[in-house]
Design a protein with these regions (language model features):
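Ankyrin repeat arrays, specifically the small/polar loop and inter-repeat linker segments at the C-terminal end
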Residues: 19, 56-57, 88-96, 122-132, ...
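Leucine-rich solenoid repeat scaffolds
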Residues: 254-275, 285, 293-298
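Non-Sec secretion/translocation targeting segments of pathogen effectors
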Residues: 1-3, 13, 293, 298, ...
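Charged, low-complexity interaction regions
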Residues: 17-19, 287
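Ankyrin repeat A-helix N-terminal signature
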Residues: 71-72, 102-109, 142-148, 185-189, ...
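Ankyrin repeat structural motif
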Residues: 4, 43, 78-84, 109-120, ...
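Ankyrin-repeat boundary/"N-cap" motif
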Residues: 25-27, 63-69, 94-104, 131-144, ...
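Amphipathic alpha-helical elements of HEAT/ARM-like alpha-solenoid repeat scaffolds that form extended
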Residues: 29, 33, 112-116, 183, ...
Length: 313
């Protein structure tokens, strides 16, 4: 179904809350605006955004704004967002608050956000990133989604770190959704990108790796990709204490990442990599003897080495 461009003009000109919609197949009389908007197709430029006036934007109710904004965000071109922000802000300095509350957080891409930020105050930028949807997911969770992570996540990280303070960035990156996932645990690829991006901040990477302790798991439990382990070990190579803590983290069943992967048998490669790293930390790192023994015992590895270390105390 294709909608004629006249529909948008009808919406603007309508004095009530109902419009007539004429499609190639039929004519629909007296449809509520929300219903009329359903005839819009994402790949069609049915809205003439350049003709949007600030008066309309400030009179529209929240449902109309949501339809308008999300229709714009669903498109590849960014001109629509530019026009909405410029026209709206011209008479309403608090337009960002309305926009933040109206948008579907799964829609905006990094290029959309870049444009919006030019029209926002710092506190509004923080509010934008802190907002979550019904699944408790924010913009960074959605940017890490499997369908977008390759093209959007790293760019979104650039924008996030450019606009917010270090403490605010950490808060956003450690925000959990309803399932306990932070942005870096949405996909294996997101985990690799996030750890590489923050490699100069190993303390934050360590926090991301243990972020689900209250849910009984973490990135190293969930992953099926050896590259996730390799990146974690690389970033934390000079932080043996933090890495040991991560490798001693237990889920609700009392399993560490190593014993979990050993029991599940999903990946022998991951199990072997974990065993190798645990052993290396225990015998060839700056861990104390007590920490080394605890690391081996909780992972049920090499009791003979643990006994040897015990006699060295």
């Amino acid at each position: 179904i294709k909608v004629k461009e006249a529909l948008y003009n009808q919406i603007l000109e309508s004095k009530g809350d109902k419009v007539n919609v004429e499609t190639s197949d039929a004519t629909y009389l007296g449809l509520p605006i929300a219903e009329a908007a359903k005839f819009f197709t994402p790949d069609e430029k049915n809205f003439d955004f350049e003709k949007l006036d600030a008066d309309y934007l400030n009179k529209a109710d929240s449902d109309e704004l949501q339809i308008l904004l999300n229709s714009a965000f669903s498109r590849e071109e960014v001109d629509a967002i530019q026009d909405i922000c410029r026209n709206w802000r011209s008479v309403n300095k608090r337009f960002a608050g309305e926009m933040i509350s109206a948008i579907d957080l799964s829609r905006p891409k990094s290029q959309h956000i870049d444009i919006m930020l030019h029209y926002m105050q710092p506190n509004e930028v923080k509010e934008l990133y802190e907002r979550t949807d019904s699944e408790m997911q924010g913009l960074m969770h959605h940017a890490a989604n499997a369908s977008r992570v390759k093209d959007d996540f790293r760019t979104s990280l650039d924008t996030l770190t450019h606009c917010l303070s270090g403490d605010d960035v950490e808060e956003i990156m450690l925000t959990k959704d309803i399932r306990g996932n932070i942005p870096a645990t949405i996909t294996d690829e997101a985990a690799i990108i996030a750890m590489d991006y923050f490699k100069e901040n190993p303390e934050l990477v360590a926090k991301m790796l243990v972020n689900r302790e209250d849910f009984g798991a973490g990135i190293l439990f969930d992953t099926s990709e050896i590259k996730v382990l390799e990146k974690a070990f690389e970033v934390l190579k000079n932080n043996p204490d933090e890495l040991a803590d991560i490798l001693m983290l237990c889920n609700a069943n009392g399993d560490t990442a190593y014993t979990y992967h050993k029991e599940m048998g999903h990946s022998k490669e991951i199990k072997n990599a974990l065993e190798e790293k645990i052993t290396e930390l225990a015998v060839d790192s700056d861990l104390s003897v007590k920490e080394s023994i605890s690391l081996l015992e909780i992972n049920e590895l090499h009791p003979q080495i643990a006994n040897y270390l015990r006699y060295q105390k």
